[in-house]
């Protein structure tokens, strides 16, 4: 599995934590930026990452911002990207299980650091249920 990851300035710190976590689990990733906490426009980083998912250059996508809302909106503009805002592990589990989400958006200002990696792991480890979904 290869995961694209991108953030704006408000999600940069959590993006760096997710990258370290993915590396520790030997999960390949590609970082689309931003590369610091300097104010920036999130679509500049989210759109290229979503394009990579759309083009099947990566298997999944994680985007991060202040609330995660704008990032999810941008990601979902690309055909084939199914990005769900996940504020807890249950949302991440259902995003995969029922919605076959191939992308998640996380809000750094809305969740605690202790929740972040649980959300990511739950989303990565959960299988799509299929069937009526």
Q: Where do the model's predicted regions map?
A:
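A short beta-strand-loop structural module common to alpha/beta enzyme folds
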Residues: 28-39
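Short active-site oxyanion
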Residues: 2-3, 58-61, 80-82
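C-terminal binding/interaction regions
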Residues: 4-6, 10-13, 89-133
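Short, structured active-site "lid" loops
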Residues: 45-63
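Mid-chain, well-packed structural core segment of small domains
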Residues: 63-109
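Short, solvent-exposed amphipathic alpha-helices that sit
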Residues: 13-24
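Alpha-helical segments flanking ligand/cofactor-binding loops in enzyme cores
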Residues: 47, 51, 73, 93-96, ...
